[in-house]
Amino acid sequence: MSRGKKTVERVVELMKDPKHIRNIGIVAHIDHGKTTLSDNLLAGAGIISEELAGKQLFMDSDAEEQARGITIDASNVSMVHEVEGQDYLINMIDTPGHVDFGGDVTRAMRAVDGAVVLVDAVEGTMPQTETVLRQALKEQVRPVLFINKVDRLVNELKVDETEMQIRLGKVIDKVNKLIKGMNEDLYNNGWKLDASKGTVAFGSALYNWAVSVPYMKKGGVSFKDVFEKCRAGDMKYLAKNSPLYEVVLDMVVHHLPNPLEAQPRRVNVIWHGDHSTKEGKAMLACDPNGPATMMVTDISFDPHAGEVATGRLFSGTLRRGDGLYVMGSAKKENRLQQVGIFMGPKRVEVEEIVAGNIAAVTGLKDAIVGSTVTSLMEMSPFESLKHYSEPVMTVAVEAKNMKDLPKLVEVLRQVAKEDPTLGIAINEETGEHLISGMGELHLEIVTGRIKRDKGVEIVTSEPIVVYRETVTGKVEDVEGKSPNRHNRFYFTLEPLPEEIVNLIKAGEITMNQQAIERRDVLLKAGMDKDEAKNVKHIKGTNMLIDMTKGIQYLNETMELIIEGINEALAGGPLADEPVQNLKMTLTDVKLHEDAIHRGPAQVIPAVRGAIKGGMLIAGDSLLEPVQKIQISVPMDQMGAATSQIQGRRGQVFDMQSEGDTITVVGKAPVAELFGFAGDIRSATEGRAMWNTEFAGFELVPNNLVKDVVVAIRKRKGLKEQMPTPSDYLSV
């Protein structure tokens, strides 16, 4: 029997015993060695050959990934590892480290219970290390640490043995400081990383060796051996006597939780339904006999089987032919056609999958990434996935040949299903479609895939920055009249306080939670009691509060009011850009008693006009995306690095020096960062290392607003003069 087939059979046996399962993700900053680590772990488990590991990039199965040498999608694989005579099933996801693909990390964190955080011994923790760690802790995913590229400390930085240990200690301290800063409760409850307890390992993924304190005691390889063998270049000795896969996977088995231990804690955070229901009890207990509940974390397309939905099964059992429901879509049954697991790029079919595993199934036509799938007709959905970055750039795409237009629309819908961090706007009338992504690289790869994988020739525009609109002041009792003059709506508009905006972004305030729970969170954040209990709608970071009293017919009209509000928020009055951070209070309503005179054609335009006109009176302004920039350069290039930030309307707010290298930290608007890569290279003679990460939206300076607005309006084919309140409010 082939080794691969044997592995699949062993995996299928172990899947039924959650005690011996570990669902883990590998997370790190770009180029710190995640995929090399994953490949060598797979080689150790016998899934790929050892000669090819590290070069094969098994987890980077996409041609684009191998060509660029980076991971773009999160890849899944199941493997078996033996510890003290007992086999364990390890379901592993390798995630991207590039900031443009952070959405994949967020989704992977929902599927796993533990994470191996990888840090380069020379570079130390970097911005993406911080971001991925924050995502892991937010999802209650427990971390262990692997410090990679230890050989570089010895051979490139020429440190001695003591200095090597000091530097490794500093990396551990820095990661602990991050954990403590993000979640002190978890840090104090045993999540602090401690090399002496075995939650930290050191090594070289490329050369296939690792050490940890427990393994040193067992295997006899000491720090002294590590130092001497690295200096002598004898990596084979280390790989033979202290193999990477054994040290890292032993650490995973001993220190990361199994689904039975993890789910009670995680379900509390990611599902806000009633824990006393049958699905609530089943998920907390990881019960294979309860109702099936699964959260879809990935959608991919298989040329033969169609759409493959991958996700974490929290309770129940999945079998071929089962009927499941996707929450939030029409109540029609989706029948499972195939049930399987992933072994890297290959999907292997199995008879059944039980709770606590990561499943790959076909037949869920209605599912998208983030869907809650269940055998029940009705259940509270899982909390939606919170991405730490937002789309900041857009390209317009058109089909090169008109005959490809229907195919392009279909492909864009597929792409939107596969990658929820993309914003896709399809305009079937003009044939121009917009794709918004996390950055230039993200958009380049998505458009490249449309051409290569989907076979559609497209023409793309230059990237355009995504703006937002918001109000800077307050306006009271703006009146919106319906076209027939029989219905009136009165709103007060003002900025939504920053603390509440942050709670919405963090998923602490949603329309899914119980009203009392939401009210309590809002009260704690300083909102007035009457307002806190009358929240009617949250869209993005905008909130509608109904402060009217005893108005006849309002209940049946509320849905139309919300529809009008959503239309106004989709494109603000200044530049038709999405609105954010707006607090709308409905203060009074006058409705016609005859339902025929207060239908959609009357209510929606009245509300939409009131919000848009009111925003202009309250001082509508533009927000632009800003990125945090970190540039590491030799001391003599410091001036070049700072001027690259300051010359782009940026600010430098920190400088840290280590040895002869200085790291300049600042921020600058995305609009000014086009071509940054080429400019920083030439300014520093190619000696700069840099990275950027999303740092939120900030107000566009007053002196630039008009020019930016006019340019956007011109591009969108709107009238070029600045709009006035009377354009929206009927007098």
Curated annotation (Swiss-Prot):
Ranges that cross the membrane: none
Domain tr-type G: from-to ranges: 19-260
Localisation: Cytoplasm
Residue(s) carrying Diphthamide: H597
Name the UniProt record assigns to this protein: Elongation factor 2
Family matches, as CDD domains: aeEF2_snRNP_like_IV (cd01681), EF2 (cd01885), EF2_II (cd16268), EF2_snRNP_III (cd16261), Elongation_Factor_C (cd01514)
HAMAP family in alphabetical order: EF_G_EF_2_A
Gene3D superfamilies registered for this protein in UniProt: 3.30.230.10, 3.30.70.240, Elongation Factor G (Translational Gtpase), domain 3 (3.30.70.870), P-loop containing nucleotide triphosphate hydrolases (3.40.50.300), Translation factors (2.40.30.10)
Family matches, as PANTHER family: ELONGATION FACTOR-LIKE GTPASE 1 (PTHR42908:SF3), TRANSLATION ELONGATION FACTOR-RELATED (PTHR42908)
Record-listed GTP binding positions: 28-35, 94-98, 148-151
InterPro entries from the UniProt entry: EFG_II (IPR041095), EFG_III/V (IPR035647), EFG_V-like (IPR000640), EFTu-like_2 (IPR004161), G_TR_CS (IPR031157), P-loop_NTPase (IPR027417), Ribosomal_Su5_D2-typ_SF (IPR020568), Ribsml_uS5_D2-typ_fold_subgr (IPR014721)
